[in-house]
């Protein structure tokens, strides 16, 4: 199915793997910032 097909986007800092989940995109392996504390 289309939801199982991997999607790879090449960015200046590297590649990001994700999936097209029929209506929204899900990205994997993107580093996230730490939550604000205080």
From Swiss-Prot:
One of its GO terms (molecular function) is carboxylesterase activity. Belongs to the type-B carboxylesterase/lipase family. It catalyses: a carboxylic ester + H2O = an alcohol + a carboxylate + H(+). Coiled coil: none annotated. It is an enzyme of class 3 (hydrolase). Transmembrane segments: none annotated. The keyword Hydrolase applies. This is Esterase-5. Its EC number is 3.1.1.1. Keywords: Hydrolase, Serine esterase. Residues 1-38 are annotated as: Disordered. InterPro entries: AB_hydrolase_fold. The keyword Hydrolase applies. It comes from Drosophila mojavensis.
